[in-house]
């Protein structure tokens, strides 16, 4: 059994997920949910020596301190990322923190290399695209037209998978849709064995969280096309580095994307049973998205925008329906963490594999529409189509939440 108390000691080093990557961090405070108090190291400044680990008496949260409600009921840690400004210090749960050991350091390097390769691949594709255009090759519109001609053959092979796929086992996993806290990190890849336990439901019992933190999850692997991985990495950079947030409501919402996918693929299906399975899969994704958005699909900078939407919906006395407001990039974030959601359920392995197969078929379809849904530049606009800049005032409030 892993000794979590020793692995995540006050003042000690750890690794934590932020975005699709892992970073070295220092534990400044530890929250005890049973006493509703936290302990901290004296003068918990980022530059302070980790050797000075003499604990002070437990303290209550101050008026200017807060812990995300999604993780406050479990043990969590206030960490400082090495080399980062203190404004990025934040509370994280067992879902994002990892022990500082050789295995996790290797995982950190592997994720960094994957992100670099994805970025490199995207740049090479963009260069080839520009070269083709300059030599009189087909324009983007021409390429999309060509893609649509081959759409039939791809959709046909895609549709066949629905003939044998079923998401009947998903019902047992719907409770996991409420999982994970706001600002949880997102991966650019979901095919790394042993790191699919990164974000788990804070609604789970502390004991279950301990098990999740100490043991690897089942090896459920999702093959995300390299171009879509690049989209996730770019998305992370837009929000965390460029301080941008997605324009809302999105021009093309999650509901519109899934409705179009269901409509196009269902035309290739002859069996009513297959069409029913397709409808159930799309309905399940919509359900997961609405339940998961506020808990696991938003970066820290996006929380304020989400809270403002909640306040507006409350004022208008209308329920907030995320699938009608958020767009394809947030749907792709959900897809990237589906293996973790699935592996936290009681679904049998065969049902998990069938659901993953359906999702990979959906990713193939998304790849064919990548320019339509993930192009951050709209020729009809002078500004960014998917992302907007935030003001310094917004950033200050959002990062202080």
From Swiss-Prot:
Subcellular location: Nucleus
Biased composition (Polar residues): 39-53
Superkingdom in the source lineage: Eukaryota
Pfam families, sorted: MRG (PF05712), MSL3_chromo-like (PF22732)
Organism phylogeny: Eukaryota, Fungi, Dikarya, Ascomycota, Saccharomycotina
GO cellular component: histone acetyltransferase complex; NuA4 histone acetyltransferase complex; nucleosome disassembly/reassembly complex; nucleus; Rpd3S complex
UniProt domain Tudor-knot: residue ranges: 13-98
Family: Belongs to the MRG family.
One BP annotation, GO: regulation of DNA-templated DNA replication initiation
Biased composition (Basic and acidic residues): 54-63, 117-126
Start and end residues of each MRG domain: 216-399
Classification via SMART domains: CHROMO
Miscellaneous notes: Present with 1890 molecules/cell in log phase SD medium.
Function of the molecule: Component of the NuA4 histone acetyltransferase complex which is involved in transcriptional activation of selected genes principally by acetylation of nucleosomal histone H4 and H2A. The NuA4 complex is also involved in DNA repair.
Protein name: Chromatin modification-related protein EAF3
Record flagged with keyword Transcription regulation: yes
Name of the gene this protein is made from: EAF3
Self-association and partners: Component of the NuA4 histone acetyltransferase complex composed of at least ACT1, ARP4, YAF9, VID21, SWC4, EAF3, EAF5, EAF6, EAF7, EPL1, ESA1, TRA1 and YNG2.
Region (Disordered): 39-65, 117-210
GO molecular function, one term: histone reader activity
Modified residues (Phosphoserine): 201
Biased composition (Low complexity): 153-190
Keywords: Chromatin regulator, DNA damage, DNA repair, Nucleus, Phosphoprotein, Transcription, Transcription regulation
Claim: Transport is one of the keywords in the record: no
């Amino acid at each position: 059994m892993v000794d979590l108390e020793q692995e995540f000691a006050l003042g000690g080093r750890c690794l934590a997920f932020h975005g699709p990557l892992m970073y070295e961090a220092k534990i400044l405070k530890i929250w005890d949910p049973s006493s509703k108090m936290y302990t901290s190291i004296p003068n918990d400044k980022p530059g302070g020596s980790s050797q000075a680990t003499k604990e002070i008496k437990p303290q209550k949260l101050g008026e200017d301190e807060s812990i995300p409600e999604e993780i406050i009921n479990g043990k969590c840690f206030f960490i400082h990322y090495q080399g980062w400004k203190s404004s990025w210090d934040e509370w994280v749960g067992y879902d994002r923190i990892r022990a500082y050991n050789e295995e996790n350091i290797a995982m950190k390097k592997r994720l960094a290399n994957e992100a670099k390769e994805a970025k490199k691949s995207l740049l090479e594709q963009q260069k080839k695209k520009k070269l083709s255009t300059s030599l009189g090759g087909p324009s983007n519109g021409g390429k999309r037209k060509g893609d649509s001609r081959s759409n039939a053959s791809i959709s046909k092979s895609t549709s066949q998978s629905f003939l044998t796929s079923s998401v009947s086992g998903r019902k047992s996993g719907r409770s996991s849709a409420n999982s994970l806290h706001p600002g949880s990190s997102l991966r650019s890849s979901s095919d790394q064995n042993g790191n699919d336990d990164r974000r788990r439901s804070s609604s789970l019992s502390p004991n279950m969280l301990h098990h999740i933190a100490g043991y690897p999850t089942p090896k459920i692997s999702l093959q995300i096309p390299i171009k879509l991985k690049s989209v996730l990495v770019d998305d992370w950079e837009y929000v965390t580095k460029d301080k941008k947030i997605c324009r809302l409501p999105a021009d093309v919402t999650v509901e519109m994307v899934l409705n179009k996918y269901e409509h196009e693929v269902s035309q290739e299906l002859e069996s009513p049973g297959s069409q029913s399975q397709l409808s159930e899969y799309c309905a399940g994704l919509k359900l997961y998205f609405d339940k998961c958005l506020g808990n696991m699909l938003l970066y820290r900078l996006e929380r304020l925008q989400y809270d403002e939407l909640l306040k507006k919906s409350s004022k208008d006395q209308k329920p907030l329906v995320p699938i009608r407001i958020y767009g394809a990039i947030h749907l792709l974030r959900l897809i990237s963490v589906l293996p973790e959601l699935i592996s936290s359920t009681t679904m049998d392995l065969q049902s998990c594999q069938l659901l993953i197969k359906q999702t990979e078929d959906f990713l193939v379809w998304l790849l064919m529409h990548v320019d339509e849904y993930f192009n951050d530049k709209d020729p009809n606009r002078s500004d960014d189509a998917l992302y907007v800049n935030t003001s310094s005032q917004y950033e200050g409030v959002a990062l202080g939440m």
